[in-house]
Amino acid sequence: MAGAKRFECPRRRFLMILLDTMVLSERRKAKPNLGVVSYLKSQAPDSIYLSALTIGEIEAGIEKQRSLAPEFAAELAQWLTLMELQFAPFILPVTPAIAKLWGRLCVQTGNKGIDNLIAATALCHNLMVVTRNVTDFESTGVRVFDPFGLPEAAGTAG
């Protein structure tokens, strides 16, 4: 398309990470994966980001539990509120730029799911997605890392 504007996302110079729902949720387990715990402890607090979609995925889980396990749902809701407060400056919304990139990724990968929105968020902000589900992101071209296989004392990736 001659004369069409090429979409560019802003780029940062330092390695920052975007946690997916599974990695964030690991933090609240009674017996979390020690590799994940070690990895998260090794990261600078201001290098860890969440997608607003992660908040939505957790909220969906809370809603599913409300009729099945109301006390558990209440615990999750309280935990989610704490995560929102802790990560408030680091929760990334879906912007028009991210939505456009997501649209391109949908065609490229043949998948219209939330993982592509998370990948688009990471690509636009030059973040590495930290997830257990590496294969869900491979076709997007985003950098991914799985901390679940790390030994307890491990810490860095990238």
Model-identified regions with their sequence ranges:
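Short aromatic/basic micro-patch
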Residues: L18, Y49-A52, P93, T131
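A generic structural signal for short hydrophobic patches within well-formed alpha-helices
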Residues: L24, I55-I58, A99, F137
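Short, well-structured N-terminal submotif of metal-dependent ribonuclease cores
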Residues: M1-L50, K64-L80, P151-G158
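Short secondary-structure capping/turn micro-motifs that flank functional sites
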Residues: I118, F137-S139, A153-A154
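Active-site regions of enzymes building and remodeling cell-envelope glycoconjugates
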Residues: G141-D146
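A general structural signal for well-ordered alpha-helical segments in protein cores
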Residues: N33, I55, A77-L80, T95, ...
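Residues at the C-termini of beta-strands that transition into short coil/loop
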Residues: A52-L53, T95, N133, F148-P151
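Active-site neighborhoods of divalent-metal-dependent phosphate/nucleic-acid chemistry enzymes
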Residues: A2-R13, A60-R66, L85-R132, A157-G158
